[in-house]
Every structure is written in C-alpha cells, then in structure tokens.
C-alpha cells in the first residue's frame, strides 16, 4: 500500500491556506495573504528583527518574503531599515498600523486552529505536534545540506 502522508500533508496545507484567506478577510484583513499573516504573527512574537530571522521564523524563502514585505510596506503595516551595527543586515518592524491588527490576526488564527483540531484529543494533538516537529526538522536539515 502506498504511503499517502505526503498527499495528506499537501492537501491540509492548501485547504488551510484557503481557509486562512477567508478568515483574514472575515476579520478585516482581506488585503493580506496567508504568508503576510504569518509574517505579522511572527513580528507580534518578536518585533524589529532581521529579514534572515523572519525568514527562519516563517519558513518563507527570501524572495517570497521580500515580495510580501514590499506589499506590507505599501499597506503601511511594516517598515524595513538597515541595521545600525551591520549595514548588510536589513531589519523589519511593525508600524503602528501593523500593531493595531494584532487582535484580528490572533482571532483568525485561533479560529483556524479550532477548525484544524476539531475532534482531536489533547493527547492526539501532542503526538501529532511531536511528529510534525520531527518532520520539520528532517526536511529543514535536508534543505540546509542542499539536495540537488
């Protein structure tokens, strides 16, 4: 029997992205893509960070992150600036407008979390998170070692 886990992971990801788009819209954040929502949530956790750190926190590649940040700057949600100590490093921080959407982002992601874990026990959720974290580590390690 063929392992269908990759198909299932991909399906959950794509449906989750569509649901998140709808939830962001419902909470007044219709201009944001799911990736931009992830960027905001990461910056709510740790503001004024390097683009490299933000890429690590969101698992977005640098080109996707750069395009998303450009759009978010146009929306007035974030601003980029050079690092005072190392001019090669670009930093990102929330604007007042970006900070004002914190509650709406939290509510949208909480709704999505509730949908995802509906019918899943806390024990199952814990096991799932441990396995998912291991899968993440496995693919991250392979990506760092640059499979060609």
Task: Give the location of each predicted region.
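Flexible interhelical turns and helix-capping residues at alpha-helix boundaries
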Residues: 13, 32, 47, 58, ...
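Generic C-terminal helix-cap and adjacent flexible tail
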Residues: 137-148
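Short, locally clustered residues in the helix-turn-helix/winged-helix DNA-binding domain
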Residues: 13, 41-45, 133
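N-terminal helix-turn-helix DNA-binding core of bacterial DNA-binding proteins
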Residues: 19-64, 71, 146-148
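N-terminal leader segment of winged-helix/HTH proteins
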Residues: 1-30
């Amino acid at each position: 029997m063929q392992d269908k886990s990759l198909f299932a992971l991909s399906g959950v990801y794509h449906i989750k992205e569509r649901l998140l788009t709808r939830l962001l819209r419902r909470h007044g954040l219709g201009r944001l893509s799911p990736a931009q929502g992830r960027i905001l949530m990461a910056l709510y956790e740790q503001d004024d960070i390097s683009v490299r750190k933000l890429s690590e926190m969101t698992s977005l590649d640098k080109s996707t992150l750069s395009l998303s940040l450009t759009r978010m700057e146009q929306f007035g949600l974030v601003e980029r600036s050079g690092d005072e100590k190392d001019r090669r490093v670009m930093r990102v921080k929330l604007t007042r407008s970006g900070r004002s959407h914190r509650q709406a982002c939290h509510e949208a992601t909480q709704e999505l979390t509730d949908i995802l874990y509906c019918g899943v026990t806390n024990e199952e959720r814990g096991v799932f998170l441990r396995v998912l974290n291991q899968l993440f580590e496995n693919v991250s390690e392979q990506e760092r070692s640059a499979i060609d």
